[in-house]
């Protein structure tokens, strides 16, 4: 049974999103001090986020980039303005993205 996400889960999933590119590099160059379970967990996260991104519409991909992957940190207000949506809609889209990531990485 899949449990619903709570206030503790979202920051963890957001950290996965922010650290995605670093995790990809670690995954590609498996450190010798990483055990198999850690590596399998990392693989699940990397492949799950990649799948969510690739399966998303271009507008959603842009939200992912602006929210979590750009070096410059944009506020929700700026991202919503750039995307032509309300901040409420942006927050909803981000929540949906994180739920998709949670499912794709077997978080829940």
Each language-model region and where it sits:
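N-terminal interaction/assembly modules
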Residues: 1-55, 78, 105-108
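A short hydrophobic/aromatic micro-motif that marks alpha-helical segments and, especially, helix-coil
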Residues: 24, 72-74, 101
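A short pre-motif secondary-structure segment
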Residues: 63-64
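Short helix-to-turn junction characteristic of helix-turn-helix DNA-binding domains
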Residues: 67-68
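Helix-turn-helix DNA-binding module
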Residues: 71-86
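DNA-recognition helix of helix-turn-helix
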Residues: 84-106
